[in-house]
Amino acid sequence: MGESRVKVTLRYHEFVNGKVVISRDALAMLKKAHYGVYGHATVELCHWTKSALTGGPSCYKVKFYGAPVGGSHRCVEVGPVGMMCSNKCIYCWRPSESFDPYEPGYDEVMSPEEIINGVLRERRRLLSGYFGHSRSSRGKVLEALQPTHWAISLSGEPTMYPRLPELIKAIKALPNTKSVFLVTNGLYPEMIERLWREDALPTQLYLSLNAPNRELFYKIANPVIHRDDAWERVLRSLELLSKIPTRTVVRITLIRGWNTMEDLIPQFAEVLGIGNPHFIEPKSYMNLGHSVYKLTKDNMLRHSEVREWSMMLLKALRDRGMDYVFMDEDPNSRITVLQNMKRYVDRWIEKPTNP
């Protein structure tokens, strides 16, 4: 990663003065979908941000971990390399068929400061309409303009951004930042190593693990970069999760008919033992966005089924000597969370007043 030359034909990006940017056609598509775009970075007001702005509930992460501090309206969901990814996952609700499998070089990308300033400007634009919203108070919008939390997890794979350690450090240095979450598909363990080595680990690192073996991984994740050793890279990332000095989570997206079969649960437990994460989040696939062209509503689980699967996983983990407990659940998001008691960390980043 990091060579400054084009190795693939870019469909949704172009070069301007040597820097990669989202192309005009892709920009129009993203703007129509209510994204903010700056260069190669993307930002969005997610469902839970909009809900919190208009008096509704916040994201399950507030309930589970107390982040974003103050509520979901104070979250910045950002993709530092929007529409670039190493995988084309079958369940992705982003337009992954519109992603370029390209690893940008250091000299081809914007600086962290450019990303932060551009993303915050675009986010202010997206928030501006809420000043006149009938169900949103001016105070809520003003709070939203002072974000406490950054979720580096939007369109694209963030660990493909070669200046990610600098970006996380710069975000942490902002006066209102309380937490930074990073979500990765695990294909770039070398970036996780860099984050650790350069003292730039996020507050909480998520790894998406949606298959317990190599064969199923290739069917679900469909890696297009590092295809020959993609599964081995995920395993290396899991090994790093067991060592790095920050909070770690493995999220499992459950897709009926693909990875929910009972005979796969012991395999999941075995692979999870490599990462030994602080938390495990089994969550139902949701038939939203562009995933509707690949999967159906029948592939979704009811929350009761997610809970039942989680309890079976809990037993399989304990059978292998791992001491996890059922920590919490959120039926609205069809998600549960298991907590590691041997590798214990307090669940709260900052305990909410009304968790």
Feature annotation, model-predicted:
Residues 78, 85, 89-92:
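Short cysteine clusters
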Residues 4-82, 96-115, 119-144:
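N-terminal [4Fe-4S]-dependent radical SAM core
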Residues 1-66, 242-245, 256-355:
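Auxiliary Fe-S-binding modules of radical SAM enzymes
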Residues 136-296, 301-304, 308:
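Conserved AdoMet/S-adenosylmethionine-binding subsite of the radical SAM
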Residues 85-88, 99, 214, 287, ...:
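Short, acidic Gly/Pro/Ser/Thr-rich loop/turn segments
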Residues 90-91, 95-101, 289-291:
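Surface-exposed beta-strand-to-loop junctions
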